[in-house]
């Protein structure tokens, strides 16, 4: 994404502010149903934890996130044994479940619970004229530069340069330049300082202090400046002039190898919706206003994929194109409704931390040429504040383009109420699944102290947690305990919950394993369960508090906690 200098500095400054927020402890009592009783802390071994968690820590750095994801089977680098390509990732057992849950909640919120939105699953490869009409074939590109010495490539709008000026120089003479990749403020300043030290040494000015850096995008450099700006890799002015690089992956359809067989992997899912507008309208008996929702894979040949799954070359999108009548008095109301619905989904349905979210309203030159308005949902990741989701008022650009490109009356709609014919406008809430997953993991990552020991855990909303509960027999060598635990485990599976059975090790150690992968509830079968018919204990992951419930009440209890009913 391209930022103006002003916007960049706001982002960089905002990073430290956002990181200063500490997680609130979030401790909450587990509401007991009729027949439940709160355990004393000394009742059994599994209740020996302190029930009040220490304050949670700030969001971790990316190394911690990446390490956790690989260690616990959330995300792996793709084809790692062959040193696979950058920008491609495989989702492990927990990652696949988390991703599925996010998509299910999104679909339920934006499609199933609405009468005016229907679904679509279009193909990944369209006729290439689709991309000609949409503008992707000619304009879907990023500016790219090469380092002639190291052969490394960069997105020009992700490189920032600053003049180097000695402190105390009243004439503000520029002794050289530094050039660094986009990152958070600490990373950029650190890289610039390293480069400036080499510059001072080369100029025989070692020991001199320099003024604060004033970063600007490389694409804003004058010809005179560009000739002196060093490559981040070589430290010398070895960068090529920026040139456009089309981001679409090219492939071929059929056995022949010629230009007529060239096709492209879709760079977005939206165009599949637009070219099917008439098909869906005629077959679903919908009337304007109505929406078409789709989620699926998209591909962009990013010049420099970075920041883990935030910017990758293969990713998934979830989008709605909501078609409305034209008119400047119409779209603002619908636009705001979709903003409100998106916030409800992100905060209430999946549990993103609201203190790490922001709303960026685009105006004037910040809008795409076809857009009437656009509001981006931003999120403060460990590497900075970035766009998470966009809600755009797109006008009728896409339907008009495909009507003209195909020569068919694709977009015209006859409104029976107003007796008018028009090409509908649309509101587009668009969200990347992979970016959302990263935001969810960053929101959920927590550290506290329980029983005098540090605890790392993922505070997933139970609705999206990959594993909903873990069933624990107190001892694995007691057949009576194991029999009851296995029976409960199988009943929970039959109910449709993804649950885990764990009998290995001390109960406290099993709790820690469950906490680290975000399992909201731990259900322990102990001797009171089998000897006194006293039910099981259910431990809440976040507060570590425990209650005892009759076995027959476990499924209704979990249903209320997970599903809300």
Regions found by a protein language model. Give the residues of each.
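N-terminal chloroplast transit peptides
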Residues: 2-46
């Amino acid at each position: 994404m391209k930022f103006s200098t002003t916007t960049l500095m706001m982002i960089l400054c905002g990073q430290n502010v956002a990181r200063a927020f500490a997680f609130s402890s979030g401790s909450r009592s587990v509401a007991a149903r009729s027949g439940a009783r709160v355990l004393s802390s000394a009742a059994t071994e599994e209740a020996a934890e302190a029930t009040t968690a220490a304050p949670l820590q700030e969001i971790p750095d990316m190394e911690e996130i990446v390490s956790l994801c690989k260690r616990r089977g959330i995300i792996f680098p793709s084809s790692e044994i062959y040193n696979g390509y950058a920008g491609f990732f495989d989702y492990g057992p927990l990652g696949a479940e988390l991703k599925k849950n996010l998509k299910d909640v999104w679909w339920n919120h934006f499609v199933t619970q609405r009468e005016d939105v229907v679904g679509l699953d279009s193909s990944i490869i369209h006729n290439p004229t689709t991309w000609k009409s949409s503008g992707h074939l000619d304009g879907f590109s990023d500016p790219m530069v090469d380092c002639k010495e190291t052969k490394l490539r960069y997105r020009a709008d992700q490189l920032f340069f600053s003049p180097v000026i000695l402190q105390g120089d009243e004439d503000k003479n520029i002794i050289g330049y530094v050039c660094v990749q986009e990152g958070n403020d600490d990373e950029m300043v650190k890289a610039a300082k390293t480069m400036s030290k080499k510059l001072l040494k080369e100029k025989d000015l070692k020991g001199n202090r320099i003024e604060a850096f004033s970063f600007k995008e490389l694409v804003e450099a004058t010809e005179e400046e560009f000739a002196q700006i060093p490559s981040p890799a070589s430290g010398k002015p070895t960068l090529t002039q920026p040139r456009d690089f089309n981001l679409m992956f090219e492939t071929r359809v059929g056995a022949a190898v010629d230009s007529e067989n060239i096709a492209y992997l879709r760079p977005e899912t939206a165009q599949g919706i637009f070219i099917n507008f008439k098909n869906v309208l005629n077959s679903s008996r919908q009337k304007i206003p109505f929406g078409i929702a789709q989620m699926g894979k998209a591909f962009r040949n990013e010049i420099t994929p970075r920041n883990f799954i935030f910017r990758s070359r293969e990713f998934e999108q979830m989008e709605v194109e909501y078609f409305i009548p034209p008119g400047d008095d119409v779209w603002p109301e619908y636009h705001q409704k979709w903003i409100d619905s998106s916030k409800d989904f992100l905060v209430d349905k999946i549990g993103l931390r609201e203190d790490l979210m922001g709303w960026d309203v685009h105006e004037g030159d910040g809008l795409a040429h076809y857009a009437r308005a656009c509001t981006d949902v931003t999120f403060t990741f460990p590497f900075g504040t970035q766009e998470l989701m966009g809600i755009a008022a797109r006008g009728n650009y896409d339907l008009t383009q495909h009507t003209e490109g195909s020569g068919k009356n694709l977009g015209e709609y006859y409104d029976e109420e107003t007796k008018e014919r028009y090409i509908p406008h649309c509101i587009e809430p668009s969200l990347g699944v992979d970016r959302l997953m990263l935001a969810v993991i960053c929101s959920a990552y927590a550290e506290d102290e329980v029983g005098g020991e540090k605890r790392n855990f993922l505070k997933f909303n139970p609705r999206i947690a990959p594993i909903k509960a873990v069933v624990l027999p107190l001892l694995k060598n007691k057949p009576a305990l194991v029999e009851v635990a296995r029976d409960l485990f199988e009943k929970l599976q039959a109910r449709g919950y993804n649950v885990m059975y764990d009998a290995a090790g001390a109960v406290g150690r099993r709790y820690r394993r469950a906490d680290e992968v975000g399992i909201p509830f731990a259900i322990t079968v102990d001797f009171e369960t089998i000897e006194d018919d006293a039910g099981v204990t259910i431990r809440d992951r976040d507060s570590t508090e425990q209650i005892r419930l009759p076995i027959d009440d476990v499924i209704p209890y979990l249903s209320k906690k997970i599903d809300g009913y």
